[in-house]
Amino acid sequence: MPSILDLPIGTGATGKRKESDSLGEVEVPADHYWGAQTQRSLIHFSIGDDYMPKEVYHAYGYVKKAAALVNEAAGIIPPWKAELIARVADEVIAGKLDSEFPLYVWQTGSGTQSNMNVNEVISNRAIQLVGGSLGSKHPVHPNDDVNMSQSSNDTFPTAMHIATVLEFSNRLIPAVTVLEESIWAKAREWVDIVKIGRTHLQDATPLTVGQEWSGYATQLDDALAFVKHSLRGLYRLAIGGTAVGTGINTPPDFGEKVADEIARLTGHPFVTAPNKFAAQGSLDAMVTSSAALRTLAVALMKIANDLQWLGSGPRSGLHELILPSDEPGSSIMPGKVNPTQEEAMLMVCIQVIGEDNAVAFAGSQGNFELNAMCPIIINNVLHSARTLGDACVKFREYGINGIMLDRSRIDKFVGTSLMLVTALSPVIGYDKASAIVQRALDENTTLREAAVKGGFISAEDFDRIVDPKKMVGDPRHDLKLASE
């Protein structure tokens, strides 16, 4: 058993070194750990500037570590070698080897080049730690040891699931949760402030500002519940299926044991997929997670759209809301302030919806025992989750928390709204109520003036019946029910 050295990351070499694979020798940069297959991918697939997300490689670290430990327990790899692979895998998980993963998203649809990138880097770093020669594949071979009992066809979908679960759990869900809490805080603060409602962009009956914002918070909560629900499918891992789902070249119960080990390492309840043919032939759990992101984007888009309309003005718009002034809004119009947080959120949501369309299309392209559209799916899902999470953080901090009400504007709209006539309809009938509205419009008077002047109702009865505060139900009860 060789001694494991305590060496800093870095080859300490310059120039080129020769590495080989089944197609022959390839020159690779001597200051990097990757090998021949990674270098071939860089040559053949240098397309655009979309790099495989680092989160995928961090997730692969968990896969390689767990597989090594399970292979050791099965007695098919020496303990020292499993320990060595696990040690380097920890460096991968921690992001210490991120610069060693240079591949583009646009590669083989199974993610084989990225799997081999991980295998080669772990192999060469492990070789370095025992004093060997980089590229020798001895004593740790990228295929025979690091990739033992595995295939790209089961490890890449597994890494996709792990990366998505971690992104959702560590970044997206917390960001949406605190945004929702801030919206609930506004709803409670403004629970009793009566405003005019709007449907079809036209005046409608009153509600309170708090009730309106409780709708935003609840819509966001429902979308967040869908995101959390999508985790259930992501917890099921394809590992153990190897090439086509049969588990060829794996020890007994390999998939179950690796999933258990990944669950232990990550703290998330990963399990083996009950049917590996479905887990590898389709990527439906990823499609579902993307659909959840789309639903969240739809909710956020509705909220942002409402806020920018309600903040329009300040003189010729609705201007019920006073939006925070983040920065000057125009290079030509002095003093102009724009709804920049809302616009940024809208663009993020549009991007997410577009990425979901790509994921859905890619998810439909599985052929027989493999869906070979893995890289585009994971790239889009992680990008959507990351941008939504970041947007929620900024939207809360600079868009929601500083919003104030223009009470005079709100009160003016309530006082002049013609839809308050709805309260009269049960008393004088729909037709007479409609006639009051038409008279108020024709004569440019208030609803009260039109009703009294037209002889439809006395002033005293009008004031008793048409009370906006009596037309909003029980706002505090509504908020209590909505938040439970």
From Swiss-Prot:
Pathway named in the protein's UniProt entry: Carbohydrate metabolism; tricarboxylic acid cycle; (S)-malate from fumarate: step 1/1
Transmembrane segments: none
Broadest EC class assigned to this enzyme: lyase
Compartments, record wording: Cytoplasm
Reaction(s) catalysed (UniProt annotation): (S)-malate = fumarate + H2O
Pfam family, one: Lyase_1
One GO-annotated biological process of the protein: tricarboxylic acid cycle
InterPro entries: Fum_hydII (IPR005677), Fumarase/histidase_N (IPR024083), Fumarase_C_C (IPR018951), Fumarate_lyase_CS (IPR020557), Fumarate_lyase_fam (IPR000362), Fumarate_lyase_N (IPR022761), L-Aspartase-like (IPR008948)
Annotated region described as Disordered, given as residue ranges: 1-22
Its EC number(s): 4.2.1.2
Binding site for substrate: 110-112, 141-144, 151-153, 199, 331, 336-338
Similarity-based family: Belongs to the class-II fumarase/aspartase family. Fumarase subfamily.
Complex formation: Homotetramer.
Purpose: Involved in the TCA cycle. Catalyzes the stereospecific interconversion of fumarate to L-malate.
Miscellaneous comment as given in the Swiss-Prot or TrEMBL entry: There are 2 substrate-binding sites: the catalytic A site, and the non-catalytic B site that may play a role in the transfer of substrate or product between the active site and the solvent. Alternatively, the B site may bind allosteric effectors.
Protein name: Fumarate hydratase class II
Organism of origin: Methanosarcina acetivorans (strain ATCC 35395 / DSM 2834 / JCM 12185 / C2A)
